[in-house]
Amino acid sequence: FRLPTTDELFGDEDLEAGKMNLKPEKSDNVNLSFSYNHQFGKHGLYAEAGLIYRDTKDYIKRGLDVLGGTSYGYYENHGHVRTKGYNLSLLYSFSHWFDIGGTFNSIDTRDYEKFLAGSSLQESMHYKVRMPNLPYRYANINANFYWNDLFVKGNVLSIGYDSYWQHDFPLYWENLGDKDSKNMVPEQFSHNLSLSYTMKNGRYNVSFECRNFTDAQLFDNFSLQKAGRAFYGKFRVFFGK
């Protein structure tokens, strides 16, 4: 079972409308994964592959509507959905100063409600069609450099890079309407950089981050664009023993 989230039930008082009578999702799940982990002297390698199968009733589906010229999201239960997919992960590390890794996910979620809701005779036009407004192929990669005992024993300087890629996907049912004029959530590729200096074995930490340093157009959903290039700084003190 998956209970509805707070936003799904009550909305966010901005761009998400809640629905208080949402039912919990009921799913039968099968997951199969294989992993490999080995250390070759200073070199480390970890690989993992997984298969996913999920049969869901009362699937909580996100939709979009327009009120007064403003788009907003809403949620509703959809009778029957099946999800099949796989994920791949790979991580390489060298000694204690470098690691690089990434993941790739392909998740195919399709409508298996053969007849329209409330009807036992009229067949659905999108039976076995991929669910709309849902990313189905995405990946990420990250790399980190570490300088241990820099300046003072117990201090660590780290520089990190990470990126996220997401395939474009249709806002509405992909089998309806003209392919060339469909509303699409565009392909997205973001890049981030970070710099962190940890002192006194983790008691103090200073970090700086530049998110989306290529200033690419990114979207939370079809109606809400994320911020462009942004810079962040943080200072943390740990008061435990």
Show which residues each predicted segment covers.
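C-terminal beta-signal and adjacent terminal beta-strands/loops
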Residues: 1-2, 57, 100, 164-190, ...
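Outer-membrane beta-barrel translocator domains and adjoining extracellular loop/strand segments
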Residues: 5-13, 59-67, 107, 111-121, ...
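Residue-level detector of the transmembrane beta-barrel scaffold of outer-membrane proteins
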Residues: 7-9, 31, 44-48, 89, ...
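Extracellular loop and loop/strand-boundary signature of outer-membrane beta-barrel proteins
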Residues: 14-22, 71-77, 85-87, 123-131, ...
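Membrane-embedded beta-barrel scaffold of Gram-negative outer-membrane proteins
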Residues: 24-84
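Residues that define the transmembrane beta-barrel architecture of outer-membrane proteins
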Residues: 26-30, 53, 80-84, 133-139, ...
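Short coil turns and loop connectors of transmembrane beta-barrels in diderm outer membranes
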Residues: 28, 40-43, 57, 95-96, ...
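Gram-negative outer-membrane beta-barrel transporters
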Residues: 47, 52-55, 76-170
